Each structure stands twice: as C-alpha cells, then as structure tokens.
Amino acid sequence: GLWKNMLSGIGKLAGEAALGAVKTLV
C-alpha cells in the first residue's frame, strides 16, 4: 500500500514535470 502510494505520487510529479517541460519547449 505504502509503496504503491509513493510510486503513484512520484509518477504524478514526473508526469506534471514532463508536461511543464514540453510546454516550455513548445
């Protein structure tokens, strides 16, 4: 449970960071 929550949180942050990077590039 704890690991799943941590991984999903990290994935969310990574996804948002990737979207932000793409927006700044475009």
From Swiss-Prot:
Q: Which domain of life is it from?
A: Eukaryota
Q: Name one GO biological process term.
A: defense response to bacterium
The record's annotation in InterPro entries points to: Dermaseptin_dom (IPR022731)
GO cellular component terms attached to this protein's record: extracellular region
Give tissue specificity per the record: Expressed by the skin glands.
Where does this protein reside within or beyond the cell?
Secreted
Output the Pfam families linked to this UniProt entry: DD_K (PF12121)
Positions carrying Valine amide: V26
The UniProt keywords, alphabetically, are: Amidation, Amphibian defense peptide, Antibiotic, Antimicrobial, Secreted
Function description? Has antimicrobial activity.
Return the similarity comment.
Answer: Belongs to the frog skin active peptide (FSAP) family. Dermaseptin subfamily.
Q: What is this protein called?
A: Dermaseptin-J2
What organism does this protein naturally occur in? Answer: Phasmahyla jandaia
